Regions:
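Conserved active-site-proximal phosphate/metal-binding subdomains
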Residues: 152-175, 181-327
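Active-site entrance/lid segments in N-terminal catalytic domains of soluble metabolic enzymes
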Residues: 1-169
């Protein structure tokens, strides 16, 4: 059940992708997601040198024989990123899947990857951008609703509206992202026309996720109202968990502060301190509204399997109700 073009293209057991998360998607975490039947996704931008990235790719390969992917960020960055260095490793190490996010993926990059047999994905926040990626030649797209954690764009379109629009407009498979945290959301995304889902925030509350226990406990206690969009004044809107750092960023933006003042709070160094040391107010954490549906820490495999099993149970209940209604 739930075999779609996404599972065919990615070679996964389930049509589920574990979204890459900066500072969090370690090789061990990525491999755990892939071993659970989903697609683990590395964040190439976590690695400052080609050697470090190659070592991380090899570490993933040593921990799983299942497919995994690498995200290439095409967003503007304060630290210059030479994606060519990552691409060389991807091709040399036979990485099976590459996801791009941010600007439209260059056609020459896609051609090189596809010539090597790499499955290509693009993550975007609008139908227009998804169509552009399809024209560029990607194999599938993840379309990201505004409920999601991370870069949600400026349009404010919800997953409920965005996914059927994308599914109607595109010929390639669509994955839904944004606020999906259980089997109900997974099944709803398929009903809307998606052929799979990308989840991120839900995976923060897993045993394998390498964030501090203090932060996991804080997320357990969080509600669906405990997120907010920030960085809109930098045209890089991000939905974040509502902590002191995120509220400070929002305050600075309201005051008309310059980019450097804002980034001094939203800096990745602060986020790393939060993730590693457990100071839950030290930095900004991307977080979806789906955090309100999360109440306990489980193994990754249990989260993935539970999502699929819950969706199956819902279908069985529907089938039983329909059968009773026709007798």
């Amino acid at each position: 059940m739930f075999q779609t073009r996404v599972t065919q293209l990615l070679g996964t057991e389930y049509p589920i992708v574990g979204g890459c998360m900066m500072h969090i998607s370690t090789p061990e975490f990525v491999a755990a997601i892939s071993n659970a039947g989903a697609l683990g996704m590395m964040a190439s931008a976590m690695y400052e040198t080609q050697e470090d990235f190659r070592e991380a790719v090899r570490r993933v390969k040593s921990l799983t024989d299942k497919p995994f992917g690498v995200n290439l960020s095409l967003f503007p960055a304060l630290r210059p990123i030479d994606n060519e260095l990552y691409v060389e490793v991807i091709l040399e190490e036979n990485v099976p899947v590459v996801e791009t996010s941010g600007h439209r993926p260059p056609e020459d990059l896609l051609a090189r990857l596809k010539a090597a047999g790499v499955v290509t994905m693009h993550k975007c926040v609008s139908v227009r951008h998804a169509l552009s990626a399809q024209r560029a030649g990607v194999d599938l797209v993840t379309v990201f609703g505004s409920e999601g954690g991370g870069h949600i764009g400026e349009l404010g379109l919800s997953t409920l509206v965005l996914i059927p629009l994308a599914a109607d407009a595109l010929e390639i498979p669509v994955l839904a992202a944004g606020g999906i945290a259980d089997g109900r959301g997974f099944l709803a995304a398929l009903a809307l026309g998606a052929e799979g889902v990308t989840i991120g925030t839900r995976l923060l509350l897993t045993e394998e996720c390498p964030i501090h226990p203090n932060l996991k406990q804080a997320l357990i206690e969080a509600r669906e109202t405990d997120t907010l969009p920030i960085l809109g004044t930098l045209h890089n809107t991000l939905r974040a968990w509502r902590n002191e750092a995120a509220l400070k960023v929002a305050e600075l933006e309201q005051q008309g502060a310059d980019m450097w003042a804002i980034l001094s709070v939203a800096a990745g160094t602060n986020t790393r301190r939060m993730l590693q040391d457990g100071d839950v107010n030290a930095g900004v954490l991307a977080c979806s509204q789906g955090v309100g549906l999360m109440r306990e820490v489980k193994p990754v495999a249990e989260v993935i399997r539970g999502m699929v099993e819950e969706a199956q149970e819902i279908l069985q209940r529907w089938e039983g109700t329909t059968n009773r209604g026709t007798n």
